[in-house]
């Protein structure tokens, strides 16, 4: 329901509400009693048509009964209808642009009287854009070495390596030994031993404890070994740090790691649309150069934003910072869930401390966004429908929905403008980065 409110005279004032927050404003509004009465009568009539009241037929309940029985509900409807309308009208008259939801205080609503309320809200600050044209950041040359390419090829071969059994000799460094073992904590005889029925260790490997390499070197299938491992206090696995463990190990088999040859058969398995080793190296170089360029550009833009924020200091609306904190917190919790953290464990976290820990980064992000929006205005940067469509198509692929479904959802929850602003800011940052060399 809407109410036309351009004719009645409205009394309003605007003032700074709290000196501590220079962006906090308040408006005090008085809506004439005849407007309030008309709105009340409208809701009384609507309730009278639908309300079911004992002793009365539906649609035949007297207005006086409706006013008494549904007084609170009707008042809530009046507030919900009139306050947003008159709030927008008054802030418009005062040339104020709220960026936060108004907090209504001092509400006065009684039959036959004007509706009076005070609403506090934040506005955007004056945003300076000093010196953005002159910011310079390093654009390092992108170089991919032959050694990096060979390391990538070796990694691809490693992923497709096979293991051949060794039956004609004892284990030596570089071999893989299939073992089972039992480990006992020597400082706690009552502790239950740790039993591992099958595991493969690489003799001399970077992830293999030295004592395992020394004691398994020279063994064959069927051999058994007993030895101690003393773990340092700073050992990575806290369950073992500082402990002395006795291991009883049974050797099951020995294996040699076989890497595939860099031939057409191996290359075809990669599905990289290349056929020869030289073509593969060229493909790897292209991908590595793209990745390095992207990484360097990301770092450069980050430094550019830091410089931009440092050059232009201004107060930031707390409401916008708090919203950004929630976005960062939600993103972090989603990442923890993907890593396997249980909901019960998340609930035990100190969210107050987490939110405060995000405040500095959130403030920087809000400042950067406001600065980029202001610069976009100055540079007349716009977002085309095609650019928005591409972004929506990308979101659709990620969420496995159709672009139409994603657009409808974004429109419904009010996120479409946010997406457009995000694209515009990215274009602005691209422009600044291109000028910063």
Swiss-Prot record:
Matching entries from InterPro entries are given as: PPIase_dom_sf, PPIase_FKBP_dom, Trig_fac, Trigger_fac_C, Trigger_fac_C_sf, Trigger_fac_ribosome-bd_bac, Trigger_fac_ribosome-bd_sf, Trigger_fact/SurA_dom_sf
Q: Where is the signal peptide?
A: none
State one molecular function term (GO).
peptidyl-prolyl cis-trans isomerase activity
Q: Which Pfam families match?
A: FKBP_C, Trigger_C, Trigger_N
Q: Write down the SUPFAM superfamilies for this protein, in alphabetical order.
A: FKBP-like, Triger factor/SurA peptide-binding domain-like, Trigger factor ribosome-binding domain
The EC class name is: isomerase
Q: List the disulfide bonds.
A: none
Top-level taxon:
Bacteria
Q: What is its main location?
A: cytoplasm
Gene Ontology CC, one term: cytoplasm
Q: So what does this thing catalyse?
A: [protein]-peptidylproline (omega=180) = [protein]-peptidylproline (omega=0)
Q: Where is the PPIase FKBP-type domain?
A: 174-260
Where is the protein found, in the record's own terms? Cytoplasm
UniProtKB keywords: Cell cycle, Cell division, Chaperone, Cytoplasm, Isomerase, Rotamase
Q: What does this protein do?
A: Involved in protein export. Acts as a chaperone by maintaining the newly synthesized protein in an open conformation. Functions as a peptidyl-prolyl cis-trans isomerase.
User: Can you say what this protein is called?
Assistant: Trigger factor
Query: Which species is listed as the source?
Result: Koribacter versatilis (strain Ellin345)
